């Protein structure tokens, strides 16, 4: 019998001790049960309105309990998930968005993966203090790499030396990679983000989660399901295609919910934010450039943001933008440049950031919050002919801000499908290729998030299979304590 199993199973631990000591007798009065196993589903974009189109999750809510979830500012994936897992605000854990300006590097970086960026006591640390040997599987929640979890599955493309990018994932333990790939195929990265993003990626994640639960039985399983993020941003939350996406995801989830029920798992389904209808893109960096505050450098006719030389620039992240101002004397000029820009609802200074628990050194000197029907582009060039070549690619790591237009193929290019087919043909024979199909026009976007919700119906939600587990509302900072309590460790 392994000592790892003994650490998880009190009766096994007693047997190990007795085997090592012939005079020892089993302690039949031990009351140290295994924690209640949990399945925590991050159903991106889930709101009370969408729940009406998701009968399996609605049934779970009806039989158990549910409440509006009070999210954090910014209401984006990395910040919200970090709050769920640490019980603290961005001001404490330091995840001020899906990316930020790394001042020491002079570079804007989004979608980093190292858990070391998240400060604070993690959920699994607290669980293991209460129950040594507590096991955790993180399946696609962010900042997974380097986390002290037992099982990890997270997206990780193969970047070949010739510039090619191919789908894949990272796992821990490493042998799990080939096990999942043999059973379910290569992780479908190009269905996870980009013009081809659809249910295929969430189905793969669901299949991987079911396999890990049935073969490893972790005490806590975290599962991230991105499907609602796609069509709700493309078409808006009330479009029939978005409502169909909700029904499709609910149907795909049913076998996983059945597995959890059969194993006696408590299920928690929650969301980080609700996606609301938008129609106004706000070119915040172009306003700063026209004011002479943002600088670019040019190579081969293409303009690149120069964050180290700029007096001020913005890192756009959905409906939030961190504005980095190099010198205090430029703060007033930066405010003036943005004061009349349509679409900005609030411009948070030091006091405003403190009010919203966003006062962290990684935050911008100012933080812009969009009006309800607006969102921020990252665009900084003034002429599309001078845009960098990566602007028309799915390049989440090279763009100095979030670009939801990557969900589309350029509708104005009559040859866009021919270009895509040619690039795909080059890829299949092992040649380098450029899938330059993303439009430079932001107007197709119909859904966004990042602001605090105006109403509960449009905000995130928490569902628990346990009756009376939650009260009238749940704060994002209380999710960690709630999960510990549901596990019997609170």
Spans of model-derived segments:
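Active-site-proximal N-terminal segment of extracellular/periplasmic enzymes that hydrolyze or transfer
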Residues: 2-7, 21-68
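His/Asp/Glu-rich, glycine-adjacent segments
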Residues: 3, 11, 17, 23-26, ...
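Short glycine/proline-enriched loop/turn "hinge" motifs that connect secondary-structure elements
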Residues: 32-33, 212-217, 449-456
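Beta-strand elements within well-structured catalytic alpha/beta cores of enzymes
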Residues: 33-49, 60, 84, 127, ...
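Secreted, luminal/periplasmic, and some membrane-associated catalytic domains
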Residues: 34, 43, 75-76, 100-116, ...
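Short, structured active-site-proximal loop/turn typified by the sulfatase FGly-forming signature C/S-X-P-X-R
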Residues: 49-92, 135-137
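A short acidic (Asp/Glu
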Residues: 50-53, 148-150, 233-234, 278-282
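C-terminal substrate/ligand-recognition segments
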Residues: 421-438, 443-455, 460-490
């Amino acid at each position: 019998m392994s000592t790892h199993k003994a650490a998880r199973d009190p009766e096994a631990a007693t047997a190990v001790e007795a085997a090592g000591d012939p005079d020892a007798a089993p302690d039949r009065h031990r009351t140290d049960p295994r924690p209640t196993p949990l399945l925590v589903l991050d159903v991106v974009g889930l709101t009370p309105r969408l729940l009406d189109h998701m009968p399996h999750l609605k049934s779970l809510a009806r039989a158990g309990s549910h409440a509006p979830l009070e999210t954090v500012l910014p209401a984006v994936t990395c910040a919200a998930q970090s709050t769920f897992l640490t019980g603290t605000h961005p001001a404490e854990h330091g995840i001020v968005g899906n990316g930020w300006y790394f001042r020491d590097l002079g570079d804007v970086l989004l979608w980093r993966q190292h858990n070391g960026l998240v400060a604070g006591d993690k959920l699994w640390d607290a669980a293991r203090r209460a129950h040594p040997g507590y096991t955790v599987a993180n399946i696609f929640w962010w900042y997974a790499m380097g986390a002290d979890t037992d099982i990890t599955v997270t997206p990780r493309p193969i970047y070949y030396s010739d510039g090619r990018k191919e789908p894949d994932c990272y796992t821990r333990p490493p042998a799990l990679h080939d096990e999942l790939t043999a059973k379910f195929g290569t992780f479908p990265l190009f269905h996870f983000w980009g013009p081809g993003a659809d249910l295929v990626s969430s189905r793969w994640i669901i299949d991987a989660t079911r396999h890990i639960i049935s073969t490893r039985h972790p005490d806590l399983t975290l599962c991230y399901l991105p499907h609602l993020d796609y069509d709700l941003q493309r078409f808006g939350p009330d479009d029939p295609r978005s409502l169909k996406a909700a029904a499709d995801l609910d149907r795909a989830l049913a076998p996983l919910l059945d597995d959890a029920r059969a194993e006696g798992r408590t299920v928690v389904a929650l969301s980080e934010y609700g996606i609301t209808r938008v129609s106004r893109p706000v070119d915040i960096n172009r306003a700063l450039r026209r004011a002479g505050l943002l600088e670019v450098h040019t190579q081969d006719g293409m303009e690149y943001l120069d964050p180290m030389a700029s007096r001020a620039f913005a890192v756009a992240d959905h409906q939030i933008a961190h504005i980095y101002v190099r010198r205090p004397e430029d703060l007033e000029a930066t405010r003036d440049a943005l004061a009349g820009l349509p679409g900005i609802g609030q411009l948070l200074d030091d006091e405003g950031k403190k009010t919203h628990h966003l006062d962290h050194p990684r935050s911008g000197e100012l933080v812009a919050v969009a009006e309800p029907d607006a969102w921020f582009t990252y665009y900084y060039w003034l002429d599309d002919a001078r845009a960098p070549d990566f602007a028309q690619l799915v390049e989440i790591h090279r763009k100095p801000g979030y670009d939801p237009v990557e969900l589309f193929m350029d509708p104005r290019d009559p040859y866009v499908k021919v270009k895509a087919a040619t690039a795909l043909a080059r890829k299949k024979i092992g040649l380098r290729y450029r899938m330059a199909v993303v439009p430079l026009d932001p107007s197709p976007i119909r859904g966004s998030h990042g602001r605090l919700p105006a109403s509960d119906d449009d905000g995130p939600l928490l569902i628990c299979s346990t009756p009376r587990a939650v009260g009238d509302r749940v704060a994002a900072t209380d999710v960690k304590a709630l999960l510990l309590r549901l596990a019997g460790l609170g």
